[in-house]
Amino acid sequence: MSVFFSRTVDKSRVWLWYSAFLCLVTAGPAFGDAPRNLILMIPDGMGPAAVTLARSYWGELVMDQILVGSASVASTNYQIPDSAATATAIATGVNTFNRAIAVDDERRPLLTLIESAEKNGMLTGLVVTSPIQHATPAAFTAHVDHRDKYRQIAAQQLEQGVDLMLGGGAKYLAAGPVTDEDIAANDLVTAMALPDQPDILWYPDLYQKAKEAGYQLITTRAELAQARLPVLGIFARDWLTAPLDRLHGDEDDEPDLAEMTRFALDRLAGNDQSFVLLIEGSTIDSAGHYYDPGWLVHDVREFDQALSVALDFARQREDTLLVAMTDHETGGLSLGRMLRDEQVGEKDYSRDWNLDILRRQKATVMGMLKQIRQGGNPVDVFVENTGITTIYPDQKKSLMGIPGMDLDDEDIEEDAMRVIGAVLSSHVKVDWTTRFHTAVDVGVYAYGPGAERFAGYHPNWQIGRIIAELMDLPVAGTSVGREQFAIDQSGKPSKPLE
């Protein structure tokens, strides 16, 4: 008699058997015992609402196929983290303080996944749309107590010997004078006095050091196809162009994230060595900081396209672990403005967000501000790039105030972008609760050998430890000098290094 109809069988046991049966028939592909390669992807600033908005715009996302869990993001000194602390947690398996680049609360350097991979004879690479010296890539390839020490990070990255580095950040590699910002960040380790002008501090040419170290230097998309390892590809002075601005602009020399991902996988997998590859969709975070939903959906899609390339690669093999997880959410995005069914004053408060506006948007708020700085009338620039013609008096006043702002001040320039973003978002009917990060849990995605280990909830530093265990890379609880120390339940070292 079938157990499903037997009166003598406990119902709870039947349910367990049935659940086990479902697990068997729905199980994914079989993999080897341990992964040989690691592809780690970070969509910087992409929270749950960003995924929802992007999915409503583009349809089902590739990342939806491999969503397995969630992670909390608190650092050791704040519930709301920054990218340096979260990247360090993932890279080292140790929780740390905001602004820290691969150091613990005592400022001791921590061994990272990429460093451990290099010590074990693996190839390593990083692909980002930020400067390569920015917080996330830096936390895998350098050790400083403050993320703003970009020149020091740049020098350490070259000493590290990462086989492939693609992104922006030319201004931190070129020779140049020490600035007030550099002094404020105490980023003076690599500076030197000029022989004929001892009162002037100057940074050396790190491009020359890269050449001496054997790197092939490339700066354009055309050069990328012919490049070989080791390669340093720097395609922008600062950040790479946002996908939305690239779509409607003329920045043809910059590769997109999927192109760089495809190139990196081809080169790193083109021999018998295993590899660790870090990929970051860096400017999703920028879209959240500046309240730009159109920028956001295009950046999430660019990341998803790169993830598709990585997932296709992993699906063709049984030896590659793909893990993607957000470092933190940015902006506190809220979708829709549900108050009541009727209009409130002159403004239409609808329950639904307006995707038609995003489909008409031709420039990010950064792109629009650039046009305003070139002399464009703020309202005309806004209308031209969004298709929005009904602009309320308070919104028009805000936009027209932009030319009077001190746009040479970086903080004020960012405020100007938020002015444009706030007007845009009000018409799209989405909202933002902060110009900074939030503490909400973020998504974790995984495919390949050991992917089931990421199911459910974990603190972000535990994700780093699981990756290290699966890859057999000694990271968590290890300093750069290989000293071991214990990790407590909060992810912090529980005793000093000996």
List each language-model region with its residue ranges.
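Bacterial N-terminal signal peptides that target proteins for export
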Residues: F5-Y18
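Boundary at the C-terminal end of the N-terminal hydrophobic targeting segment
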Residues: A30-G32
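A post-motif C-terminal structural segment
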Residues: P35-N37, M46-V51, S56-T88, G93, ...
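A short glycine/threonine-centered beta-strand motif
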Residues: I42-P43
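Glycine-rich anion/phosphate-binding loops
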Residues: A102-L111, V144, D148
